[in-house]
Amino acid sequence: MSESNEPEILFGIYCPPHPQPLLSPDANAGYAKLRAAFDECRRRIEESDADIILVYSTTWASIIGHQIQALENAVWTHVDDDFHYLGSMPYEFAIDTEFAHAMKENSEKRGLEARTVEYEGFPIDTGSVVALQLLNPDNRIPSCILSSNMYSNRAETIVLGKAVRDTLAQQGKKAVVVVVSSLSNRMFTEHIDPAEDRIHSQKDDDWNRKILEFFGDGRLEDLSQLSRDIHGQIRVQKVVAYKPAWWLAATMGQHNNYDGEVLAYEALHGSGGAVITLTPASGSVGDKEFDEDDVEFYRGDRNVLDRGMLE
């Protein structure tokens, strides 16, 4: 894509996948705070002029390539695998089929294995259902949902994000992008009283709070570069790597030039649940750890390492 044909991403949202903020927000003060944070994000989306809400959900795991929801009117009733006692989640989502099919084509052009999902009754995952029910309850804005491939590593995930940028630029659509993922994902393996919910361990809480500092400072690319360390420290090894920051950085732009805001951070059955927003800033690229440009055309070095040197 040419430099003049950049996608317009209004802001990004990072939110947790578990159903408590949707189904039982009053069971715990923390769940209520997460629900209030979702509601604030919903308000911001409603006040924006977004054309599409794009969801990358870590609870929609794929094995063969990358799947893209393309059914124009996705209607079903979902029950969460773990928290089925909280009740059913009936949903009806308006999917941007034009975007979905173009996203498949652009993913394949970049060398990825991709396919659309377009049939009645396909089981949309908990994280996507929770996010879209809370962020876009009236289907005011069409959405599209992308899977998270269990085996993809950094390069493949980055390319997926760039395929998103290709598609948004190609169609001229303004987007709000949503990553659905826990921070730490260790959960209690027995029933707990929701009123006594807490982060699974002190180590998990310490790492979560450091990650939140980075998000609050808008340091998205720094988090992307640290993803393997994060995965090794606070993530159950269910998949190859912790991918949300890779995808979000590749989609929004691989730099630290964002205004970050942590709206809520609470425990969800032991895991770290946070609602965060990242808005592209209008200032300079900055001077944070990985503040090199994501170069498409070479025009000489920026000499960032010379900053602050004595004459």
What role is predicted for each listed range?
Residues M1-D51, S62-V159, E190-E311:
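Flexible, D/E/H-enriched segments
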Residues D51-S57, K173-L183:
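Beta-strand elements within well-structured catalytic alpha/beta cores of enzymes
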Residues K162-Q170, A175:
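Non-transmembrane, aqueous-exposed alpha-helical and coiled segments at domain scale
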